[in-house]
């Protein structure tokens, strides 16, 4: 049975046709020398990285949320392919969110695979904006981590969207809004644990007009600079961050995550544009799991990982620029320096804490309060005295080709008026 034509399929066709036309016309392309210079600059960024001593009692896990397999209608990815991709990207966990199909309960991977924790879930449609064509935006519900009480006979169509969200949560699952720019009814933001504040597939779709040039460069360089060309995907998600800040400023505890939305299905001119191993390295959601009282080097349990995500003890990082493992943002007692609140936590006690930031390499550090940049400096560490109660988060940037590029986006710490 032929698959339906999707926006992603249409995009691939447009790119393919444009790429062929440009090649036939002998169009110019980015010189290998420029891409080599870019590679050397990125290598210099990565070479300056240092190991940040971990916070006692916590472990930083690097992972990917929102990936698809052959159990989705728009991907042919096999388990061995995304497990290999996870190994290439040095992931600690992988959340699979196939478009809902009862087979995910039978055939879908779930559990421990060596050092990799795999958590199965599903993606459910949430409707689209009224626009048509490539400008149309469609949101989704990402549900994962639900227990065995949701059985293969579970039918999402039997519920309204609010009831579906409640059902997933009732069975122990986490619920996030995917493709959050497509959410047409703001009530959903108050029903879920969090939202994607970056989605790779959406960003690639928004940049589709520049893709023919991308594909020609990829083709003529024989894929030698695939990583360097995909650095163009890394952009600060201004609209989504502004939406997220409005929600948290209004008192909603909304956890921000990254959505890789990996399909490994975009092949143009015989070249696979989005292999799992590469898409898993562009963006990672790091989770700080609580391992206090445990000396075991074994991977923390799925429940411990999900608990940290639920609390918002996590941050996003564009790892293709530089590995951000070891990043720290916490509130500390100004007298002892002891951490008193981690990302996602609420603090309302006296005295008001200091905010501490540590990076694994020098970068621009920006303190954002209630959605507004309040302080910026360049360095590897920062101890900052907040100006008063508010919702504080951190963004970090790395300079590449004379421009500051988004690197790290933290979840907020909520300082209440009581402090």
Listing of model-derived features with the role each one plays in the protein:
Residues 1-21:
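N-terminal secretory signal peptides and thylakoid transit peptides that target proteins
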Residues 223-229:
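Short glycine/proline- and acidic residue-enriched helix-loop micro-motifs
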Residues 157, 229, 233-236, 298-301:
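Residue-level preference for long, well-ordered alpha-helices that form the structural scaffold
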Residues 27-28:
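C-terminal motif of bacterial Sec signal peptides marking the signal peptidase cleavage site
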Residues 31-60, 72, 79, 250-256, ...:
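C-terminal functional module detector
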